[in-house]
């Protein structure tokens, strides 16, 4: 009898599971660059199938999660798919979500109110008054199991490669914004709490059962979401744990949790260990300078002393399966407008990287970007420019992603540590038009058959470096040098 040289049961997991790009720096922290079949580099980072966001009150965790999911919907559910916000705290205002999208570019936004008003729309808001958390999950659990049986013909092509050198296909995206898991009510818990007396021993047992039900639910999520082609993020509250024994030492499951902070209303082990990433807000404050003026005013004329519209929140990644654990991220928010993605990129360049990719005039009185040197700006004009000048915002975005790879991706080839000023010079020397690049490209990947509705080419900073070095010819760009003499189309 011949010796068996290989096991009889070998089933390969996908070569990669595409993530949803939702924010330049968040995506870089949670991903890696992958070379596509078309010779372009694509960033596989961002929202994974299961994600967690935690923090105390007023740390913008709900806004962060909602912004990411609205971005995901606009980018990946343009022609298919479904998104839902499960509001367990009865605090969601659809008009606020519309306001959060005012800083999105045209190709990544969508008619949220129109989708909500349409009973067959691609976006929905539900809450605990309409259905309990266990009923909501049980229905989704069943749907995901059915979706897992889909054939390749039902899926959409991505730019990512599979084992055989073909394209990875995905089901139309379903995504869910659960805010919050802490307050998500389970049917059995509701019935039992109605009968009991507040604070009784019986009530304490009920809440232990509630935690057990949520632990089972999150465990199922980690299995069902990848199989069913869905993405889910959930928020949880952090608070100080109460010690019954004041002399007992602190026991922390993860090193990033300071003091005796503890997740409330969720099973800590499942919430922190099963998601691909778990971000926790550790600090929050106003963005005011030493003179109590806004660090970044809306305009030179409108800057007002003591204006606290701008907030900065520092997040720490407690769990990072797609990136380093313990890394911190500073996100910037306007209390009126929501997350300011590109202002956060500039803050990263200016304050964290010490002015990487820019020329600083005087004592930080003004700046020019190496990738867009034509525009001079100050701290009080940058917010307006980021809203009105797409080329400026794109230059900030590219520079921030270059800076992140330069200083954080230590194991990558030295070629991709190129300085922005060198990139600008070499790409221009190759005959490309930087105005075309900044105006008509995006960093995020999209489904291959969505190009006509997006009408922007995916060109990451890595692809730009390959263009600069003559390793990639961007024949798809209007400014491709060969098009002027008819050699390429």
Where are these regions (language model features)?
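The Walker A/P-loop phosphate-binding site
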Residues: 1-118
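Conserved inter-motif catalytic segment of the P-loop NTP-binding fold
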Residues: 83-200
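Active-site/pore-lining binding-face segments in mid-to-C-terminal subdomains
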Residues: 312-357, 361-377, 381-386
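Helical mechanochemical/support elements of P-loop NTPase systems and associated helical scaffolds
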Residues: 61-64, 93, 132, 136, ...
